[in-house]
């Protein structure tokens, strides 16, 4: 039987053989829980750049234990000023699960809200050349195509940026549909 002690993040990090703990982290019900132990609250209040960087790491499969430590420490230290290494491993795992789950919910919402079905003309023109530039394109659009303002945009709350991107998409969709109406009237 595996014996799991109530250790800290630092103690776990310093272990030579983490296999029993890794197994527990991957499969034990206790470690699969998602709790807002760090009182992060609504992740849409986090800076847009933080959310986007986390989304990028999740999408690319880079959200490992070290990166979880980085993000929780970055967010938590702003609130409490304490170092993540002193945290109990179980609290850290369930707290980072909460953060990742909430970021994944935002990713799913974005997929639904911002998905654009390209036209044949857009595909023929090479729309796919913009693949991989998604986050940068969002930042650039929010900065009004002024790349010197991108860092300022990254500091804005995610909720504000999401609302603006949603508004831009609605305006784009409206103009596209309106142009189609005008185009069909001109052909009649």
Segments predicted by a language model, with ranges:
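An amphipathic, hydrophobic-aromatic interaction surface with interspersed Lys/Arg
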Residues: 1-188
């Amino acid at each position: 039987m595996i014996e799991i002690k109530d250790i800290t993040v630092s103690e776990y990090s310093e272990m030579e053989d983490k296999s029993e703990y890794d197994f527990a982290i991957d499969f034990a019900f206790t470690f699969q829980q998602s709790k807002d132990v760090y009182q992060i609250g609504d992740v849409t209040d986090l800076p847009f750049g933080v959310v986007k960087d986390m989304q990028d790491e999740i999408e690319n499969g880079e959200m490992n234990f070290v990166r979880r430590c980085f993000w929780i420490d970055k967010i938590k230290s702003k609130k409490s000023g304490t170092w993540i290494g002193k945290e109990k491993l179980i609290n850290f795992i369930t707290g980072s699960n909460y953060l990742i789950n909430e970021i994944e919910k935002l990713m799913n919402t974005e997929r639904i809200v911002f998905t654009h079905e390209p036209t044949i003309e857009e595909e023929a023109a090479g729309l796919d050349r913009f693949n991989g530039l998604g986050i940068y394109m969002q930042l650039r659009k929010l900065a009004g195509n002024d790349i010197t303002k991108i860092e300022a945009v990254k500091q804005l709350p995610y909720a504000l940026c999401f609302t603006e991107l949603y508004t831009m998409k609605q305006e784009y969709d409206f103009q596209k549909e309106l142009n189609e109406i005008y185009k069909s009237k001109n052909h009649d």
